[in-house]
Curated annotation (Swiss-Prot):
Complexes and interactors: The complex is composed of two ATP-binding proteins (PstB), two transmembrane proteins (PstC and PstA) and a solute-binding protein (PstS).
Catalysis: reaction(s): phosphate(out) + ATP + H2O = ADP + 2 phosphate(in) + H(+)
Protein name: Phosphate import ATP-binding protein PstB
EC number: 7.3.2.1
Database matches in CDD domains: ABC_PstB_phosphate_transporter (cd03260)
ABC transporter domain boundaries: 5-247
Record-stated family: Belongs to the ABC transporter superfamily. Phosphate importer (TC 3.A.1.7) family.
Gene name linked to the record: pstB
Alphabetized SMART domains for the sequence: AAA
């Protein structure tokens, strides 16, 4: 079931380095929110904090609150592994398990959770591959290695793997940056379909992509080298691209910097 995300006064640190300052925003359920901004502005750092993936970096910590339907994902006793099951991640480059079969790639998470029923695994594999618009392309070779698929197919396989464990939120960190234009269009169409069932947050450097797929857009910027990234503004995507409130947003979207 898609859930709402709320960030309140979020500050992110890596050791003594203050990476992101004072972020507050809300992501409605069944909505695509795009994070845009120049390199180093903190958008991917914020994205990774939404399911505690940034914690794999030593010294990382978050101050403030990140709430999933009102529950603080950094609260006492909250298991990061459980958070990452509820809030899935699709990375910049397709990362299927290359020697594992297509089917086993999809159900790897379920197997880690102890699922052993072949019927259940088969059902989830088909449902997830259909959900990722990949089923018709791979249904006759489910036992073949996932690494043998094209780049675009591999990324859709990774999306199928992410949705197989029934998350509430999907995070996508530049999911099309390594893909050709045709594969990119397929992923964008898929994102539009997936938002019927999931809350989606996507980081992208592609302004046209943000305008095409997102319902709201958040613009992040960096004041200066060594300073933390900040959220400049967030609004409906149409307004951000046609009539932004902040001059920095307009300058970035129009290509004056970034």
């Amino acid at each position: 079931m898609a859930k709402r995300l709320d960030l309140k006064d979020v500050n992110i640190y890596y050791g003594k380095f203050h990476a992101v300052a004072d972020v507050g925003l809300s992501v409605p359920p069944r909505n695509v929110t795009a994070f845009i901004g120049p390199s180093g502005c903190g958008k991917s750092t914020v994205l990774r904090s939404l399911n505690r993936m940034h914690e794999v970096t030593p010294g990382a910590r978050v101050e403030g609150s990140i709430l999933l339907d009102g529950e603080d994902i950094y609260g006492s006793g909250i298991d990061p592994v459980g958070v990452r099951k509820t809030i899935g991640m699709v990375f910049q480059r397709p990362n299927p398990f290359p020697t594992m079969s297509i089917k086993d790639n999809v159900v790897a998470g379920l197997k880690l959770q102890g699922e052993r029923s072949k019927k259940r695994l088969d059902e989830v594999a088909e449902r997830s591959l259909r959900g990722a618009n990949l089923w018709t392309e791979v249904k006759d070779r489910l036992d073949k290695p996932g690494g043998g698929l094209s780049g675009g197919q591999q990324q859709r396989l990774c999306i199928a793997r992410a949705i197989a464990v029934s998350p509430d939120v999907l995070l996508m960190d530049e999911p099309c940056s390594a893909l050709d234009p045709i594969s990119t269009l397929a992923i964008e169409d898929l994102i539009t379909e997936l938002k019927k069932d999931f809350t989606i947050v996507i980081v992208t450097h592609n302004m046209q992509q943000a305008a095409r797929v997102s319902d709201q857009t958040a613009f992040f910027n960096l004041e200066a080298t060594g300073k933390p990234g900040r959220l400049v503004e967030i609004d409906d995507t149409e307004k951000i691209f046609s009539n932004p409130t902040q001059k920095a947003t307009e300058d970035y979207i129009s290509g004056r910097f970034g």
